[in-house]
């Protein structure tokens, strides 16, 4: 049995510190804490592996390199290769409807307008997979949504997201150890 943790984002230095890359930021924080290098190429992305818990369960950490709107291709390839059921895939991504740094876990649900999640749902053929959303806040007046998500965080929002990352990493650890319901009960803010 294996699990797949996916951080949604866009590749390249231009997007590295943008709001839309909050999923990658969280995946990187988890990988750093557990000494995993996410640098193997495959599944139209970069991935790394670790063993988790007393049973040394395989956990794959994946960053799709397809750009956000095609992320599902990468996720589906990795899930098929490792024979991972949707319930064992945790997708990490940004959410406009949550204040910066707020966390929300769900066992399943709609894409909520997030194109990366829409792609994952389309490629997996189901919306029945766990997800962890990281708040990035709504656009400031005068901003279009696309410009907002592809812009870097302002200083206050960057601080809020950075402060939330350790708790978000703990939420991922809880998902791996105890499952999505325990993680939801403990870490939804």
Swiss-Prot record:
A molecular function (GO) term: tRNA binding
Binding positions for tRNA per the UniProt entry: 15, 67, 69, 115
Localisation: Cytoplasm
Catalysis: reaction(s): an N-acyl-L-alpha-aminoacyl-tRNA + H2O = an N-acyl-L-amino acid + a tRNA + H(+)
GO process terms (BP): protein quality control for misfolded or incompletely synthesized proteins; rescue of stalled ribosome
Site (Discriminates between blocked and unblocked aminoacyl-tRNA): 10
Pfam families: Pept_tRNA_hydro (PF01195)
The protein's assembly and partners: Monomer.
Family per record: Belongs to the PTH family.
Stated role: Hydrolyzes ribosome-free peptidyl-tRNAs (with 1 or more amino acids incorporated), which drop off the ribosome during protein synthesis, or as a result of ribosome stalling.
Name of the protein described by the UniProt record: Peptidyl-tRNA hydrolase
Organism expressing this protein natively: Symbiobacterium thermophilum (strain DSM 24528 / JCM 14929 / IAM 14863 / T)
